[in-house]
Amino acid sequence: MKKFSLVAATLIAGVVLNVNAATVATVNGKSISDTEVSEFFAPMLRGQDFKTLPDNQKKALIQQYIMQDLILQDAKKQNLEKDPLYTKELDRAKDAILVNVYQEKILNTIKIDAAKVKAFYDQNKDKYVKPARVQAKHILVATEKEAKDIINELKGLKGKELDAKFSELAKEKSIDPGSKNQGGELGWFDQSTMVKPFTDAAFALKNGTITTTPVKTNFGYHVILKENSQAKGQIKFDEVKQGIENGLKFEEFKKVINQKGQDLLNSAKVEYK
């Protein structure tokens, strides 16, 4: 629900200090901690722990933060804190934060009965369905002949032997940069994820088998190995309970906040010019 502006996010970033924070850089004698950087980029990281990021990513974020800090230092040197535009933007940010606090106070008063959550699930079970999925690898090549040659190389192989050889050929021959280094691995996907000719061929296979003819798509010619499959199934209530509750809570919040706004409007003296 929180929708802080960039200005507000910049203002509040780094307010909370962690006693275990580690210094990652100094800027003109001022220490920069990993906690400051982590909190500043929290909206972008979306729950990822800054400390667990690869070193090159951490360095890039630290550098961005340092640039932001240097701009801030330069702005202060120019005494822009007294600039009318700064004052205007600061007041606007404060107002936005105050409205968010007001709305969150109302949201926190709303409680959704557990029976109502279960009833919603029972009435909408058709919406809570896991689609059928397959796990597959593929080898993408430019010509039909190349695909046929690969199929011939794989002919007669089964189980681990087939899987190992398929991965080897994918790394050697596939022109799909997104999967070749993983041995052609595509992971799990449903029927809406891939182009139709590919999906139709993958779903038609038995687990542990490959396509016996090349599969043509707009990308080229594919050889597909179906590794595993999952049938369509009902998502359990416990898996979606929190999401349903949050959704119902937000719908109730919209009604409450709209009514509150209407009541305030009705009680105010408004003159349109």
Swiss-Prot record:
* Record-annotated PpiC domain positions: 131-228
Q: SUPFAM superfamilies of this UniProt entry?
A: FKBP-like
What InterPro entries does the database record attribute to this sequence?
PPIase_dom_sf, PPIase_PpiC, PPIase_PpiC_CS, PrsA_foldase
Catalysed reaction(s)?
Answer: [protein]-peptidylproline (omega=180) = [protein]-peptidylproline (omega=0)
Its signal peptide is 1-21
Q: What class of enzyme is it?
A: isomerase
For this protein, the Enzyme Commission number is 5.2.1.8
One Pfam family recorded for the sequence: Rotamase_3
GO molecular function terms attached to this record: peptidyl-prolyl cis-trans isomerase activity
- What are the record keywords, sorted? Isomerase, Rotamase, Signal
**Cross-referenced PANTHER family:** FOLDASE PROTEIN PRSA (PTHR47245:SF1), PEPTIDYLPROLYL ISOMERASE (PTHR47245)
Name the UniProt record assigns to this protein = Putative peptidyl-prolyl cis-trans isomerase Cbf2
Q: Which organism is it from?
A: Campylobacter jejuni subsp. jejuni serotype O:2 (strain ATCC 700819 / NCTC 11168)
Which gene is annotated as encoding this protein in its UniProt record?
A: cbf2
